[in-house]
Amino acid sequence: MADQLTEEQIAEFKEAFSLFDKDGDGTITTKELGTVMRSLGQNPTEAELQDMINEVDADGNGTIDFPEFLTMMARKMKDTDSEEEIREAFRVFDKDGNGFISAAELRHVMTNLGEKLTDEEVDEMVREADIDGDGQVNYEEFVEMMTSK
């Protein structure tokens, strides 16, 4: 399953995983799991989280190591996000509800997730998603970004 991930995806997941592996012992607690997945653009429900945890946490000790995490993310990515999950994620980023994600809104959310990005990195993320070149990301552009593999 995890062997279907690209090197870039694995590197992204490793980075996200290590953000939440505070003590660097190679495991994350289950309650951190939801936060990690949301930082990667996934939007699991509580029930889905519980199911995923039960599936992966083989020894039932409440922590997940990186190989288990990779398997789980690969599984989750196979079930492509529903329209509603994408809309929900868009609303998280669109703080003022104007239908656009600005660089400032993106920076705010990413910072809250523990991602310290430079202004250049944030601007680059917006540029990559900004199809019509207006300097912001609208819902259609967001959907395109979330669903393009």
Swiss-Prot record:
Pfam families on file: EF-hand_7
Q: Which residues bind Ca(2+) 2?
A: D57, D59, N61, T63, E68
Binding residues annotated for Ca(2+) 1, in chain numbering: D21, D23, D25, T27, E32
Q: Which residues carry this modification: N6,N6,N6-trimethyllysine?
A: K116
Q: What exactly does this protein do?
A: Calmodulin mediates the control of a large number of enzymes, ion channels and other proteins by Ca(2+). Among the enzymes to be stimulated by the calmodulin-Ca(2+) complex are a number of protein kinases and phosphatases.
What is the protein name given in its UniProt record?
Answer: Calmodulin-2
Family, per the entry? Belongs to the calmodulin family.
Q: Which GO terms describe its cellular component?
A: myosin II complex
Key word Metal-binding present in the record?
yes
Additional free-text comment from the UniProt record: This protein has four functional calcium-binding sites.
Its Gene Ontology molecular function terms? calcium ion binding
- The organism is Branchiostoma lanceolatum
Residue stretches making up the EF-hand domain: 8-43, 44-79, 81-116, 117-149
| Xref: SUPFAM superfamilies | EF-hand
Q: Which residues are recorded as modified (N-acetylalanine)?
A: A2
Q: Where does Ca(2+) 4 bind?
A: D130, D132, D134, Q136, E141
Keyword terms of this UniProt record: Acetylation, Calcium, Metal-binding, Methylation, Repeat
Positions annotated to bind Ca(2+) 3: D94, D96, N98, E105
